[in-house]
Amino acid sequence: MSNWKTLNANYVYKTAFGNLRKDTCELPDGQIIEEYYVNEYADWVNAIVLTKEKQIVLVKQYRYAAQDFFLEIPAGKPEEDEAYEHAILREVKEETGFISEKQPILLGEFYVNPATQTNKVVSFLIVDAHKAFDQELDPTEFIDVQLVDLNDMETMIATGEINQLFTVSAYYMSKSLLTK
């Protein structure tokens, strides 16, 4: 199997949020795709945050593209040259006010949609978290913090109360570590 070749790449637009690129590609058999669109987004981090009382820290926020509210795990984008581990600790503290003296446990790094997007999500587990600060939200963030008993997560996923893919996948990746 051979790689595709990029014959030409032009930005349709660039923004602080992400870029849209239009490429011309050559397939291994010589076919040409004149307009292949690639979304360039930054990597982001998320975490299952477990308190000492065996509750999972979730955030509820409105997601404009889906036109609905979602119950999710804390997440965010690393700042310039910020290590993923530092980024998730900062994001959890800013969004929820929770911290932990223990280091985040890496669950994995996964491409979000490698067909059309360049970014990865890096998922962590943070244990023994406790509330130590008030939220420090960005001007465009409106987030409610909710604590959910660990034993209720699977029911909430099964019933669709939690239906954001990256929250669900991080939970199931962390499950074997949560029961220890």
Predicted features and spans:
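Acidic, metal-coordinating catalytic segment for phosphate/diphosphate chemistry
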Residues: 10-46, 52
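Short, structured loop/turn "capping" segments at alpha-beta junctions
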Residues: 85, 96-107, 117
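Short, solvent-exposed loop/turn elements at beta->coil junctions and helix N-caps
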Residues: 10-11, 108-113
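Active-site-adjacent beta-strand/loop module that shapes the phosphate/pyrophosphate-binding cleft
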Residues: 24-29, 113-132
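Conserved hydrophobic/aromatic beta-strand scaffold that supports enzyme active sites
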Residues: 20-24, 58, 123-125, 145-147
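A short, amphipathic edge element
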Residues: 1-10
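Nudix hydrolase/Nudix homology domain
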Residues: 4, 69, 80, 106, ...
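Conserved Nudix-box catalytic region and its N-terminal flanking loop in Nudix hydrolases
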Residues: 36, 41, 46-90, 137-139
